[in-house]
Structure formats: structure tokens, C-alpha cells
């Protein structure tokens, strides 16, 4: 009797994904691919049912736990993003592990639903089966392993593709196996030393790369009149502000963008460059600059965005804010930046701000509650990197609350940040390059899902970021105005690394040959961001072009009719 109950639990669990299977069947249509899909589905489903009859309890429960955790991962991802988990997206999730606490808090409702459904799988596999059919004793525990190996083989030869529509508990385990294999075997060579020649000294005493978090270019007033006040669109005493308008990010996930900003990967060769070429820190030290990293996101010395201990050794000052609440982290980073700008030392300063990464419930003080109604506040103000998602399930009204909370956060962590920087900072000997790691999908179009970025099939806003140069008014650095008209709304993150190297005094011709065009040249950028950054096993990157005519702005949302950038304001 217990055996039949177990089978019923597993069949009910499998059947609960009927819409997932139907979508795949409809996409394949009638033909050989459908036959192959149905055959693989039958093999994996049968292997799962056989696993339920494994005799050793420890083995049965081990299989149950592994499959359950895997199923929860994929089910929750599908609920959150309303899209399929590709292998590239899986790798990006692994690299974004530093945000796991925020993700659990942000998406706890979707994860809870996935976990509740997975209880059917857990008990269907784990409960003692009782009397079993006459089966070879090795078949039940070996069958799911063989099924998993078969799926891994398919994914390997198809560059990570081929699991769509199959029983969900196998896919993340197969992805994890492939990722482990690649980690062990993919080595493109050792890190190289700096070989570029310098044409002269650094052009400024302080060179600053200011990387915001989750700040979408279409929500700031410097590009959209109805956007949030940034203080970047108005003249400021003693400084020159050059607005390059909208820019394309490297990718729509933090780790992918940040590691490329630090190593200078190009669209055509980023995997090799990021893995083997010198870091921005190495270039700075060769140019005679000190190196400072201000990390507002992590604490306790924990590294993120694919930074390693080896890379960290080239950083002279590694700054985090262990005892500072999240809501004050960007202001703490500002205070340290202001102090560094005044110390008279030549240095490269890279800042990772808190910005507006989810959750945004409590990332701004009460005085900045301008956009209302907003998400509920006050429950986690003393806990770093957490927030609440109670009552948020992705309905249109929920996204209204989210967008308002997001704009309040931007008003504080961008607007107030720059107001204080211009008021307190000595920028007379500094050049600051400001951007964000990626944009945001705030679901202005009413598209389904709970996700804001890292989607495998994103809206263009996920790759849309601001790009601004700020420098002391009397400084003679690069000629930002030379090609500004052509480069405005037409450049990308890929232009930043060569710009930084030229500011450090490296030979421009050599820099361009290795890393591409800087912002003082016609960038001729394709204006794309990469949604398959972790292109593995022979797969190709997937660069998505941003059509500014399709980007939604706050003004169009307020008007109740999403409109193109060029027309909304």
C-alpha cells in the first residue's frame, strides 16, 4: 500500500507541471524532436519512480533531498522570472551567490510555494516503500543516476541546451555537474603581467570608477525629465559634468558586469581577457597609483563579483562597512571617498555602491519617502541586506509599490549621494566615471514575474545604465566633448576600461588595439548587452540590442501609457 501511495505522490508532483510540459510540446510541434523529447521524458520519469523503491533508507532519503532541493531551485526560478532556467543563467546564479540572503528574502513567497509543492516529491521518494515489485536490487538506486548521466551527456553535446520541459528535479543537478566539470577542466592560461607602455603620467591625481547597483538609466532625471533627482543634470561649482546619456551594460547580472569592468573584457574576447589579462589594479600600480576598493555591499572581508584573494593582493586599501546599516552604507562609502579625495595621494578608487538592489523596502530613510504609496517599511531596518516581501506577488499594483520604493531608494542612494559629493568632495584633481552594473525590469509593461534583472530573456531596460564623467573644472584629461554628440546614447561599459587606462597614461593606440575604443573616440558601439555571458560548452554569447524607441520611462508610466524614450518626455 505504501508503494502505491509513494507512486501517487510522485505522479501528482509530475502532473502539477503540466503547463510546463505543454509549452514545450507546442514549441516542438509534430516531428522527430517531439518523439525524442517524449522518449527522454519517459526515461527520466520512470527512473524517478524506480528511485522511490530504493531499499537502504539513507540512500533513499539522500536521493529524495538532492532531487527536492534541485526541483525547488528550478520551480522557484520559473515562478520568479516567468522564464526557463538556461545553463548560462544557472552559472550566473552561482556567481551571484553573494546575494543569496537578499534573494531568499525578496522571493520568499515564490520559494515557499515551490518548497510546498516539492513536499510531494520529498515524501514520494523518501518514505519507506514497503513490499516492492520483483526488481534487481541495484536498479532502483542506479536508475535515477543513469537518467541524470544521460541528461548531462545531452547537455554537454548541445552546449547546455536540451533540458527544457523535462522533469524539473534533474535539470539543476545536471547543470551543477557540468559547471563542476568546467571548473576543473577549463583553464585558458595564467594571468599575464602588464606589458602596455605608458605615454606619460596619469592625467589626474585621483581616478574613480563609481559603480552603482541596479540603477536603471531611464529612472534618472539627467536622461528623463520626469526621472528621480540625481544632481547630475545641473551645473555644479568647480566641476565639469559630461553626460553620455544612456549606455549599454556589459550584462544584466552584477558579477558578469563587475568582473569585466575590472579586467577589460571585450565583446569578442571577454572570456580570455577576463581570465588571463592584468586587472585594473595591476595597471594602476604599474602607473604609480595606489589602489583602493570600497565595497558597500559585502561585510566581513567576504569577496563578491568573482573577485579572488589573488586579485585582492593588488588592492592597497580594501574597505567594507561591517557595522553600518545598509541604509547608510552608500553614505559611509561617500565619507571614505571624500577623505580619499583630500589625502593628496595619487590613486585609483573603485566603488561598488549599494544602490537599489532588491529588496528596496528600507534602503532609504523616512525623510526620502517622496514617492507613495510604497512597499511596507520598518521591519528590518537594523538588519543588513534584508527586507520584506509580505503581500508582494507580482500583481500590477504590487509593482506600483515597488517602483515607488525603488524611486525613493534612488533619490537617497543616488541623488543625496551626489548632492553630498559635490558639497563635500574635493574634485579639483579627480576624474570620476559613474555608471551602474545593470538596469532593472520594473514591469512597467505589465509583464509577468517577480524578477528585476538577470533574466534569460530580458526587457531592454535590464541593460540600460547611466554613464557620466565628472572631473575638476581645470583638469586637462581626455577630450570628452570631441565626439560627445555621436557617443551620447550610443556607448557602453566596454568603453570604460580603455578610458581608465588612457587616464592612467597608457599609450592610446596600444590600449585601443587590445581593449577597444575609449570615450574620447567615436565609440561606434553596437549598443548591446550580453544575456548569455556564461557561454559554455561551445554556446555563443547572446547580445541583445537596446532600441531606445522601446524603452519605458517614468513619465510614460505615470501617464498610463508606456512610450518610447524619444517621445515620452
Which residues are covered by each model-predicted region?
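Metal-dependent active-site segment of extracytoplasmic phospho-/sulfohydrolases and closely related
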Residues: 208-209, 409-452, 500-504
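Histidine-centered active-site microenvironments of extracellular/periplasmic hydrolases
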Residues: 223-227, 428-430, 435-475
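Flexible glycine/proline-enriched surface loops and loop-helix/loop-strand junctions
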Residues: 264-266, 401-402, 477-484
Amino acid at each position: 500500500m505504501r508503494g502505491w501511495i509513494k507512486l501517487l505522490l510522485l505522479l501528482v508532483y509530475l502532473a502539477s507541471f503540466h503547463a510546463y510540459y505543454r509549452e514545450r510540446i507546442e514549441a516542438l510541434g509534430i516531428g522527430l524532436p517531439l518523439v525524442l523529447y517524449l522518449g527522454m521524458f519517459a526515461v527520466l520519469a520512470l527512473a524517478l519512480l524506480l528511485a522511490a523503491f530504493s531499499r537502504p533508507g539513507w540512500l533513499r532519503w539522500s536521493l529524495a533531498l538532492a532531487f527536492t532541493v534541485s526541483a525547488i531551485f528550478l520551480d522557484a526560478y520559473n515562478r520568479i522570472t516567468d522564464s526557463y532556467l538556461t545553463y548560462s543563467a544557472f552559472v550566473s546564479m552561482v556567481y551571484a551567490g553573494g546575494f543569496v540572503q537578499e534573494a531568499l528574502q525578496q522571493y520568499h513567497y515564490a520559494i515557499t510555494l515551490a518548497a510546498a509543492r516539492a513536499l510531494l516529491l520529498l515524501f514520494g521518494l523518501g518514505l519507506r516503500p514497503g513490499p516492492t515489485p520483483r526488481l534487481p536490487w541495484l536498479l532502483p538506486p542506479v536508475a535515477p543516476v543513469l537518467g541524470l548521466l544521460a541528461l548531462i551527456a545531452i547537455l554537454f553535446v548541445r552546449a547546455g541546451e536540451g533540458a527544457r520541459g523535462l522533469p524539473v528535479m534533474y535539470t539543476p543537478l545536471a547543470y551543477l555537474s557540468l559547471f563542476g566539470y568546467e571548473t576543473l577542466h577549463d583553464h585558458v592560461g595564467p594571468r599575464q603581467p602588464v606589458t602596455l607602455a605608458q605615454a606619460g603620467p596619469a592625467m589626474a591625481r585621483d581616478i574613480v570608477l563609481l559603480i552603482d547597483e541596479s540603477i536603471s538609466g531611464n529612472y534618472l532625471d539627467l536622461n528623463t525629465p520626469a526621472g528621480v533627482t540625481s544632481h547630475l543634470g545641473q551645473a555644479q561649482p568647480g566641476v565639469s559634468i559630461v553626460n553620455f546619456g544612456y549606455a549599454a551594460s556589459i550584462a544584466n547580472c552584477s558579477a558578469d558586469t563587475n568582473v569585466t569592468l575590472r579586467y577589460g573584457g571585450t565583446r569578442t574576447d571577454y572570456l580570455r581577457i577576463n581570465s588571463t589579462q592584468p586587472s585594473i589594479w595591476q595597471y594602476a600600480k604599474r602607473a604609480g597609483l595606489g589602489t583602493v576598493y570600497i565595497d558597500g555591499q559585502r561585510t566581513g572581508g567576504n569577496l563578491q563579483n568573482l573577485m579572488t584573494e589573488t586579485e585582492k593582493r593588488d588592492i592597497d586599501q580594501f574597505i567594507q562597512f561591517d557595522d553600518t546599516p545598509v541604509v547608510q552604507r552608500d553614505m559611509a562609502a561617500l565619507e571614505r571617498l571624500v577623505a580619499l579625495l583630500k589625502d593628496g595621494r595619487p590613486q585609483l578608487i573603485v566603488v561598488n555602491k549599494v544602490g537599489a538592489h532588491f529588496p528596496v523596502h528600507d534602503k532609504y530613510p523616512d525623510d526620502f519617502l517622496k514617492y507613495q504609496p510604497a512597499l511596507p517599511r520598518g521591519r528590518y531596518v537594523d538588519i543588513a541586506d534584508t527586507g520584506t516581501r509580505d503581500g508582494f506577488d507580482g500583481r500590477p499594483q504590487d509593482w506600483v509599490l515597488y517602483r515607488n520604493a525603488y524611486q525613493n531608494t534612488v533619490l537617497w542612494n543616488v541623488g543625496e549621494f551626489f548632492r553630498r559629493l559635490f558639497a563635500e568632495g574635493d574634485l579639483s584633481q579627480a576624474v570620476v566615471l559613474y555608471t551602474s552594473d545593470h538596469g532593472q525590469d520594473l514591469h512597467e509593461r505589465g509583464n509577468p514575474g517577480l524578477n528585476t534583472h538577470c533574466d534569460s530573456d530580458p526587457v531592454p531596460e535590464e541593460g540600460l545604465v547611466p554613464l557620466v564623467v565628472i572631473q575638476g573644472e581645470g583638469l586637462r584629461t581626455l577630450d570628452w566633448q570631441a565626439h560627445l554628440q555621436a557617443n551620447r546614447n550610443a556607448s557602453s561599459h566596454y568603453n570604460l576600461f580603455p578610458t581608465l587606462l588612457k587616464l592612467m597614461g597608457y599609450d592610446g593606440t596600444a590600449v585601443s588595439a587590445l581593449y577597444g575604443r575609449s570615450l574620447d573616440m567615436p565609440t561606434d558601439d553596437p549598443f548591446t548587452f550580453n544575456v548569455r555571458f556564461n557561454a559554455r560548452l561551445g554556446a555563443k554569447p547572446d547580445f541583445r540590442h537596446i532600441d531606445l524607441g522601446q524603452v519605458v520611462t517614468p513619465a510614460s508610466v505615470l501617464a498610463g501609457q508606456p512610450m518610447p524614450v524619444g517621445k515620452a518626455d
